[in-house]
């Protein structure tokens, strides 16, 4: 596995947090704990099962043995080899990492975007990095990723020494399209999903069969739980590729909790354009220009 790049003492003293965001570095300076590290009240934890596509109640919990469908998640394990993983991270580490919120560092390859005003600029954007060409080509070989053409790549670097995390959030839907694709490198972690919608989730007995047998094995719902009290954990092995679509992309917020970063982790997220920038869309010409630049694979971090 790729060795983690050493960080200087100066880097571990620097902080990129703003507003309510914090990391271990600024918390030591402030002498406070982040509120999201405290156990949330009335939260029931479920674990996503990639074999069935269901979220299953954790062992020894009130909902052990109960589950609900969790569509919109595709997990491809061993998408890259250990050797490819090491080379990808080595190439990333040749370029500078910028400090970011909540103990993260980042490298961005994409247009400059003002999401609030829904405006973007292509100045300075010269494409995705050359080392992503093979990654993008390989994605298109998998069902569900046909025709996936990313116009933005964001590399995020997490490490336990900085207390890296990312708060629950939904990715923008004005510019970014239906499929959100992330490559998890260097260490396993957990993506935590939550939903703030009112109402309840209907639970069934947890399925134990293969997906094609679920129709016959699942009984009618007989329990329910409030959406706002549920968190679904999606385990992400190192070198795995995660695709979020549908409800998992647009309705469930995703986060990485600090406690789930036990070693250096690099996440590479790829985003495609929304329909507004696609064929027949209001900004089709701009979308074509963004694709032309992105898929030249001549980029450096912006």
From Swiss-Prot:
Q: What is the effect of changing residue 254 to A?
A: Loss of function mutant that acts as a dominant-negative mutant when overexpressed, leading to multinucleation and cleavage furrow disorganization
Q: Which reaction does it catalyse?
A: an N(6)-methyl-2'-deoxyadenosine in DNA + 2-oxoglutarate + O2 = a 2'-deoxyadenosine in DNA + formaldehyde + succinate + CO2; N(6)-methyl-L-lysyl-[protein] + 2-oxoglutarate + O2 = L-lysyl-[protein] + formaldehyde + succinate + CO2
What changing residue 169 to A does, per the record, is: Loss of function mutant that acts as a dominant-negative mutant when overexpressed, leading to multinucleation and cleavage furrow disorganization
Changing residue 171 to A: reported impact? Answer: Loss of function mutant that acts as a dominant-negative mutant when overexpressed, leading to multinucleation and cleavage furrow disorganization
Domain of life according to the entry: Eukaryota
Q: Which Gene3D superfamilies match?
A: Alpha-ketoglutarate-dependent dioxygenase AlkB-like
Q: Which cellular compartments is it found in?
A: Cytoplasm; Nucleus; Nucleus, Nucleolus; Midbody
Please list the tissues where expression of this protein has been recorded.
Widely expressed, with highest expression in pancreas, ovary and spleen.
Q: Which InterPro entries match?
A: AlkB-like_sf, ALKBH4
The residues listed in the UniProt record as binding 2-oxoglutarate, with positions renumbered to this chain, are: 265
E.C. designation(s) = 1.14.11.51, 1.14.11.-
Task: Kindly give any further remark recorded in the entry.
Answer: Actin demethylase activity has not been directly confirmed in vitro; however a number of experiments strongly suggest that ALKBH4 acts as a protein demethylase.
Q: What does this protein do?
A: Dioxygenase that mediates demethylation of actin monomethylated at 'Lys-84' (K84me1), thereby acting as a regulator of actomyosin-processes. Demethylation of actin K84me1 is required for maintaining actomyosin dynamics supporting normal cleavage furrow ingression during cytokinesis and cell migration. In addition to proteins, also demethylates DNA: specifically demethylates DNA methylated on the 6th position of adenine (N(6)-methyladenosine) DNA, thereby regulating Polycomb silencing.
Entry protein name: Alpha-ketoglutarate-dependent dioxygenase alkB homolog 4
Whose protein is this, by species?
A: Homo sapiens (Human)
The protein's gene is named ALKBH4
